[in-house]
């Protein structure tokens, strides 16, 4: 039986979507229903990464995070998960997340359209790094080399 609602966390707030459209993409939902336009639509087929978001899921009493392409994932995918979008990374006092700060500090964007997707992919990488490891990451993009020091 298909559930008549989708429940997920956004900014530590429980969101309930009643009678969700199973054909609505996460990208469309984020941009039209949540009115958050930081997540971009590029290719609409999961190839460019401009639409990257991060989902958290409780697995064996631990939250596992995974970057996904929101343009090819659908609203029911959110059920029981935590949604993290680029707008959620800035703290309430306006301080940038370390990944965002590094993008600014090292001039890690060009026109800026794909930058939210880069930031979310890097955030996913930060979640995947074991505790207490320092990693230097070189992100190559045409004309740009970004060096980020990630410390957990």
PLM regions and their residue ranges:
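Signature of N-terminal electron-transfer/Fe-S-associated modules in redox systems
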Residues: 1-152
